[in-house]
């Protein structure tokens, strides 16, 4: 789980595009806190801190504590809006949570040992079907990433969710099928049948020797 952090915030009395533009000119970002059966709370948070948190990665899987006046609110960033041209944050949605909350999160997938994967060493290509997996997880134990070891995969292999060891109490949202996360695809000059023939040839030479 990523290390939590604290954000200082202020209540936002005015809403609307004009007010939001003025806030951004003053180094602030409009945001809202919702959830836990409480009314939505309009706030502002520092632009610079949000910018760096978003672009550092793991923003939507890391718990934050928002300090508002004398109140401390535990939240999980659920969504954010970026400027389509300049890529700076425009707005953030925070989900209010508690220590016992179970939340839905998109957890990034990290692939390990690409340099030793048999299929990749023979020229195969890692075709990533899902860069993230939507899961439910305890709010206080959200993993930074789901790690998949490629060291045993060959050309033509598919990696399904059933082959992945998920952390305790982390469950994929999709339950009705064994969905694919990635495949090791053959390069244009080599198909799977060629790879199989090569393996059989190697095995035959080994037995002969």
Swiss-Prot record:
Protein name according to UniProt: Large ribosomal subunit protein bL25
BP terms from Gene Ontology: translation
General function of this protein: This is one of the proteins that binds to the 5S RNA in the ribosome where it forms part of the central protuberance.
Record key words, sorted: Ribonucleoprotein, Ribosomal protein, RNA-binding, rRNA-binding
Any Gene Ontology CC annotation: cytosolic large ribosomal subunit
Molecular function via GO: 5S rRNA binding; structural constituent of ribosome
SUPFAM superfamilies noted in UniProt: Ribosomal protein L25-like (SSF50715)
């Amino acid at each position: 789980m990523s290390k939590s952090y604290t954000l200082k915030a202020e209540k936002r009395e005015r809403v609307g595009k004009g007010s939001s533009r003025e806030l951004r000119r003053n180094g602030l970002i409009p945001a809202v806190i919702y959830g836990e059966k409480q009314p939505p709370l309009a706030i502002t948070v520092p632009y610079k801190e949000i910018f760096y948190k978003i672009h550092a990665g793991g923003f939507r899987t890391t718990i934050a504590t928002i300090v508002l006046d004398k109140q401390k609110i535990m939240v999980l960033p659920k969504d954010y809006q970026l400027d389509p041209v300049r890529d700076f944050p425009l707005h953030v949605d925070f989900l209010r949570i508690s220590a016992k909350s179970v939340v839905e999160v998109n957890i990034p997938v990290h692939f390990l040992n690409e340099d030793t994967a048999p299929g990749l060493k023979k020229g195969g290509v890692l075709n990533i079907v899902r860069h993230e997996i939507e899961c439910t997880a305890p709010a206080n134990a959200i993993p930074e990433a789901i790690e998949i070891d490629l060291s045993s995969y060959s050309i033509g292999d598919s990696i399904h969710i059933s082959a992945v060891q998920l952390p305790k109490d982390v469950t994929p949202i999709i339950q009705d099928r064994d969905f694919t996360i990635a495949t090791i695809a053959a390069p244009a000059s080599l198909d799977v049948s060629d790879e199989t023939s090569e393996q059989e040839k190697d095995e035959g030479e080994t037995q002969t020797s």
